[in-house]
């Protein structure tokens, strides 16, 4: 599970520490180079529901391995880009192959482990995503400054290919997958009514709230780590490409925090766990306004730790709230909303940057986090809790 998470996130955000460098190399605007981040997340958002529907009855392991191979190819080809437009294209293509990992791994975990261990196993997968995000960002920055930015893509693509081989060897085939059952026409499990199925999923209030929380969670993470690179590369910080890449060391905290969070969430519940995690992230974003680099690093650490815990809680809640016959499709819809948040974060904060630089970006992102907090606390209430509240 950890290796699946690493491969999923190794290349997704590898251009973040390179943005100031790419701005110079391609003589492009900040908004244009930020599209190298947005294009990848947009690809995930577009393909996620398709993967969810098409792969629901395919062998989970084969889909995961094929997707990791599919991710590595456009990553390698990105090194051949001669214009910013070509680089954006390869990033989009890479994103289109990623949902085969994301959507299917979440479902695989739900099928292979009992409910009482699901949050813990999900935390291991999320820890892998934290490690992958860290390795991708740091290696791309260091390799770009030591050699060239093209070397970064070649190295990440090669490692992804090796990861596909390791997953093929080590990941066991699914054992707990339920056998397909005939579905009544018009039911959520009816393959003839995909549109109907999606419509019914969006009628489940807890799922809609989960989709919205996912959108806002990734929006805050990508928004901060994309646009703060421009803030920290300018005076008074004036950080180099390598120094910017080392900021992502804070992702390693997620390797410790997230598994621990799995135990905590099991004890305190999903709503309380996600509320505390989002509040932690909000404090972290506000700390990045400090003129001190150590304070900024502490803020980024709190932000990323809170996001990883929120991911664990949200993905666990997704499994609980989804109808059993439509869990892969629900996971695909969640990923669409989640990565639409990442796509918007690559460009929308640019509007606020033009109005008031980094402080304006922070104000907007904190508002988005507050909205996510409200949706989780209110929207995740079970029917029993709502009935008790109404009776009171």
PLM regions with names:
Residues 172-211:
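Juxtamembrane intracellular "pre-TM" segments in multi-pass secondary transporters
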Residues 86, 115-116, 124-170:
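Helix-loop-helix hairpin linking two adjacent transmembrane segments in secondary transporters
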Residues 271-314:
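C-terminal transmembrane helical hairpin of 12-TM major facilitator-type secondary transporters
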Residues 90-131:
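Cytoplasmic helix-loop-helix junction between adjacent transmembrane helices
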Residues 70, 74, 85-93, 294-302:
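Paired small-residue
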Residues 48-59, 256-269, 353:
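Helix-to-loop junctions at the C-terminal end of transmembrane segments
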Residues 46-85:
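Conserved MFS/SLC helix-loop-helix module at the cytosolic interface between two early adjacent transmembrane helices
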Residues 27, 59, 80-86, 114, ...:
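Helix-breaking motifs and short loop linkers at transmembrane-helix boundaries and internal kinks
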């Amino acid at each position: 599970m950890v290796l699946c998470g690493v491969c999923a996130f190794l290349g997704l955000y590898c251009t973040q520490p390179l943005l100031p460098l790419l701005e110079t190399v391609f003589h492009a605007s900040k908004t244009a180079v930020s599209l190298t981040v947005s294009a990848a997340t947009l690809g995930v958002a577009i393909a996620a529901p398709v993967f969810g529907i098409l792969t629901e009855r395919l062998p989970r392991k084969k889909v995961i391995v094929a997707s990791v191979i599919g991710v590595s190819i456009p990553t390698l080809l990105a090194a051949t880009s001669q214009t910013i437009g070509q680089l954006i294209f390869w990033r989009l293509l890479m994103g289109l192959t990623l949902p085969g990992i994301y959507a299917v791994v979440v479902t695989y975990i739900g099928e292979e482990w009992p409910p009482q261990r699901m949050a813990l196993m999900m935390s291991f997968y999320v820890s892998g995503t934290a490690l992958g995000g860290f390795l991708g960002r740091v290696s791309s920055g260091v390799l770009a400054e030591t050699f060239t930015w093209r070397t970064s893509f070649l190295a990440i693509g090669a490692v992804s290919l090796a990861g596909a081989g390791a997953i093929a060897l080590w990941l066991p085939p699914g054992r707990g997958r339920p056998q397909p059952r005939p579905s009544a026409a018009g039911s959520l499990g009816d393959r003839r009514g995909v549109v109907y199925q999606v419509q019914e999923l969006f009628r489940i209030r807890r799922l809609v709230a989960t989709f919205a929380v996912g959108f806002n969670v990734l929006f805050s993470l990508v928004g901060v780590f994309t646009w703060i690179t421009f803030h920290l590369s300018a005076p008074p910080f004036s950080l180099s490409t390598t120094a910017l890449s080392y900021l992502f060391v804070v992702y390693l905290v997620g390797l410790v925090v997230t598994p621990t969070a799995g135990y905590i969430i099991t004890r305190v519940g999903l709503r309380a766990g996600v509320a505390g995690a989002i509040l932690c992230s909000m404090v972290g974003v506000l700390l990045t306004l400090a003129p001190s680099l150590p304070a900024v690093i502490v803020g980024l650490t709190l932000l990323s730790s809170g996001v990883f815990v929120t991911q664990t809680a949200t993905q666990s809640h997704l499994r609980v709230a989804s109808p059993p016959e439509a869990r892969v499709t629900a996971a695909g819809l969640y990923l669409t909303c989640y990565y639409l948040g990442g796509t918007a974060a690559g460009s929308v904060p640019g509007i606020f940057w033009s109005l008031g630089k980094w402080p304006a970006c922070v104000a907007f992102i904190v508002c988005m986090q507050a909205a996510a907090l409200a949706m989780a606390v209110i929207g995740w209430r079970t029917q029993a809790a709502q009935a008790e509240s109404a009776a009171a």
